[in-house]
């Protein structure tokens, strides 16, 4: 609790730095120098942070707060070490994920990581430059990134259920999907408490339509799906038509599908009804592509928030930049990761607020450049559209909070979001590395539990624990 409070205090102070950092004279950045050591399933150790601040005392305050923030969002602290393994999952060979038995289930990792980080100048009384006053060279960042992202997702092949179940990241995908299911379900319920019918949703970066069934189960009335990749949009629309045409199908929402770059194009100009308002905008594993420049990030937020009704929500998942930078600074090179995922930065020590590019690769499924998202900056920018941050948790914090609910726990089992450990005689574990399951083996020895346990391998947990969930509410 103390760590959480400290993290919130740090972010409030950091917002002022974020405002002052973006100026027209030089690129804004913040510098972090950490000495950390690998420990257990994650990274831990004492952190030293160097920032440009006006006094040594304030710098020390920021250092201490960032240490707290890093430890709370990392997976290496002693109190968090067991993470997912205590959850018990019986073997259910015929269980599928929440997305149903359709052969066109969502390829969970069409959605990709993102981040958040630390800030530069700490002088709050210094001139406070408006966020719009971004350096000219930020405005002239190289063209082509958006088309590269679109091309990458257009080239991804649809994979059937059988092949997907054999993937090294099968449980990782299902776990990420469970996180989204719980997040979407929770905020649909909040909307339903305010209005009983005619719920309208904008799915920003819908991919191939992996969340369609979630919206159907949420009994919404209208869905607008947008994505930068035209092939993905066509597959999403086909998946919707397949759902609609099933003989046993219940009522399904109406939908429209738009191919557009939400960071460069104004979506209301493409809506059938430009006056349409939304109750929820969902942006899952997408925000980070927009932080190439201020203009792109602002356009993404405008598209996400401008047409939200008062009391509506902007929800999503995005990488935790504090965690990304912490792991980077702990690495001896400009990259970090394991056999499942890799993150490679261009250099260490200088992390601009916009255009801080890194390459992310996930098991051959995702391989595309992304940009850090400094969350206090995202929070500050969202205020322009009358949005208030009402929820923010790391994936670990979110899991530990939501798994206490029996419905969520049953959904976790149905979706096969955790791997049964130990494997039975007719199956094998997804990882051949013994140390990938040391945490589960240790838990078995120290606790009287019903077997098999449900867990993620160490490698999978390292990959998924770079994310956080968030929700903003539109104010009156």
Curated annotation (Swiss-Prot):
Residues 1-128 are annotated as: Disordered. The record marks 208, 214, 239, 288, 370, 467 as: mRNA cap binding. The keyword Phosphoprotein applies. It catalyses: a 5'-end (5'-triphosphoguanosine)-ribonucleoside in mRNA + S-adenosyl-L-methionine = a 5'-end (N(7)-methyl 5'-triphosphoguanosine)-ribonucleoside in mRNA + S-adenosyl-L-homocysteine. S-adenosyl-L-methionine binds at residues 180, 205, 227, 261, 284, 289. Keywords: Methyltransferase, mRNA capping, mRNA processing, Nucleus, Phosphoprotein, RNA-binding, S-adenosyl-L-methionine, Transferase. Catalytic subunit of the mRNA-capping methyltransferase RNMT:RAMAC complex that methylates the N7 position of the added guanosine to the 5'-cap structure of mRNAs. Binds RNA containing 5'-terminal GpppC. Belongs to the class I-like SAM-binding methyltransferase superfamily. mRNA cap 0 methyltransferase family. This is mRNA cap guanine-N(7) methyltransferase.
